[in-house]
């Protein structure tokens, strides 16, 4: 049996990773998604075990210490990580996995899975990214300022990735991702 492939989707907060991921999973039912663990509070509409596994800081530290996480990172005062077992099991069973993770985690994955396809999603411009963050209506002015500062740093790392895509249109970006995934999974 052929082993599955690992695909990493990264980019600044507000660039559209979640929307793209949701559409990709709908279009590619054979693609598996790893549900991340986080210490942040659930946002409206998020479902435990589907959107994230929500844990407290002590539980997250225990997961790090017992090496239950493939990668983990801190973002905006909260921790995020990818449970190791589901990723390994799916890949061994021949299913390709997609991870939506932060830059720090993507760098960790590169060391563990050097053959992973790493895709960086870029905004059309910083002004557009700022507009998207405000449009979500879920962050304070201070939080948005921090996210934009971090986005500037993250954008500098885009060239570390195998592929960089500007998300100026969800449909155009999805078409590009479809082509990329088709060739990568062959």
Swiss-Prot record:
The enzyme's E.C. designation: 2.7.4.8
Domain of life: Bacteria
Keywords per UniProt: ATP-binding, Cytoplasm, Kinase, Nucleotide-binding, Transferase
Keyword DNA damage attached: no
GO cellular component, one term: cytosol
Gene3D superfamilies: Guanylate Kinase phosphate binding domain (3.30.63.10), P-loop containing nucleotide triphosphate hydrolases (3.40.50.300)
HAMAP family, per the entry: Guanylate_kinase
Residue positions binding ATP: 11-18
Protein family (similarity comment): Belongs to the guanylate kinase family.
Function: Essential for recycling GMP and indirectly, cGMP.
Pfam families found in the cross-reference section: Guanylate_kin (PF00625)
InterPro entries: GK/Ca_channel_bsu (IPR008145), Guanylate_kin-like_dom (IPR008144), Guanylate_kinase (IPR017665), Guanylate_kinase_CS (IPR020590), P-loop_NTPase (IPR027417)
Catalytic function, reaction form: GMP + ATP = GDP + ADP
Record localization: Cytoplasm
Naturally occurring in which organism (per UniProt): Trichodesmium erythraeum (strain IMS101)
The keyword Nucleotide-binding is annotated on this UniProt entry: yes
Protein name (record): Guanylate kinase
Membrane spanning stretches: none
GO molecular function terms attached to this record: ATP binding; guanylate kinase activity
Ranges where the Guanylate kinase-like domain occurs: 4-182
């Amino acid at each position: 049996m052929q082993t599955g492939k690992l695909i990493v989707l990264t980019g600044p907060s507000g660039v559209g990773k979640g929307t793209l991921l949701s559409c990709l999973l709908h279009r590619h039912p054979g693609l598996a998604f790893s549900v991340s663990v986080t210490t942040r509070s659930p946002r409206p509409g998020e479902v435990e075990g589907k959107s994230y596994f929500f844990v407290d800081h002590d539980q997250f530290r225990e997961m790090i210490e017992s090496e239950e996480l493939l990668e983990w990172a801190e973002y905006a005062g909260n921790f995020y990580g990818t449970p190791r077992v589901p990723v390994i099991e799916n890949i061994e069973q021949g299913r390709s996995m997609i991870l939506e993770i932060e830059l720090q985690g993507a760098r960790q994955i590169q060391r563990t899975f050097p053959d992973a396809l790493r895709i960086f999603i870029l905004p059309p411009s910083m002004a557009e990214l700022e507009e998207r963050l405000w449009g979500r209506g879920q962050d304070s002015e201070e939080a948005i300022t921090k996210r934009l500062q971090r986005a500037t740093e993250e954008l500098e790392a885009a060239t570390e990735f195998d592929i960089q895509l500007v998300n100026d249109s969800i449909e155009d970006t999805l078409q590009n991702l479809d082509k990329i995934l088709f060739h990568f999974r062959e």
